Amino acid sequence: MSVQSITESNQPPVICLMGPTASGKTALAMALKDALPCDIVSVDSALIYRDMDIGTAKPTKSELVQYPHRLIDLRDASESYSAADFCRDALVEIAEIRSNGRIPLLVGGTMMYFKSLIEGISPLPTANPEIRQAIEAEALSKGWQAMHDQLAEIDPVSAERIHPNDPQRITRALEVYRLTSNTLTQLTQIKGAKLAGDVLQLAITPRERSTLHERIALRYQQMIDLGFEQEVIKLKSRDDLHQDLPSIRCVGYRQMWQHLEGEFDHDEMIFRGVCATRQLAKRQLTWLRNWPDLHWLTTDDKTNLAQVLSLLEAKH
């Protein structure tokens, strides 16, 4: 069956290309874009930020001209972006791509985004600062154990899961109840809109863990050489950014920020940045090893493109 017949026979399939950081996802996505009538959609919680290009390994401006990516540069570094935000935006992009008879190619390493899109996400309310302040004030007066006891009365299932010494999660569970009159347990059993139609799920990673570690270290040094420090200096010069923001908590940015604060020297920053990136890759691989219906590809395997085309044809 030809590539043309894949897009014409039914609703075009969605390709999900996942993998740990530095595994070669972008290179394979570009090869697929050359071979297929597809549009790339980024699935990366770091690439959504503007002015954070080097430390996120965002494709270069020239690459983006040739291989446009949707869902990048959506937010300022001072703003947040949730899995629910991603699902909403991704479903719109996917519908538009499919309506043009093209294949949506979702590429990235933010596994929670993929999971939320494929399985649907619970319709939880956004944070409410006033209610949070009220809960925190009550906790200051009564103590967090009393707040946990309060949670146990209205939502025993959540209280069983949440430790009494976890104020952030206690606050969220109480906040959800006060906002909706439904418990967190009730709402998480409801799933929202999710990806429909044919989905081909792929994961790419090197055969050996040591190879992935080498690629991570090499890429981190390349980021330094490209001016990563200057990128973070520019971000740090802003009055509205700080270490607790999701953008600055991105791997690499946190370590560079701490270095610029004088917490450790340049060599230690590189060491910590590489270690944090390795830990991220390990978490990503843990997600993927438990992922159903996944086809594995090996980094730098010359047959990857042919394998994907064959899998697509087998689906139709």
Swiss-Prot record:
Name this protein carries in UniProt: tRNA dimethylallyltransferase
Gene that this polypeptide is encoded by: miaA
EC number: 2.5.1.75
Family annotation (SUPFAM superfamilies): P-loop containing nucleoside triphosphate hydrolases
Residues under site feature: Interaction with substrate tRNA: 110, 132
Organism: Colwellia psychrerythraea (strain 34H / ATCC BAA-681) (Vibrio psychroerythus)
Region feature (Interaction with substrate tRNA): 44-47, 168-172, 249-254
Disulfide bonds: none
The protein's required cofactors: Mg(2+)
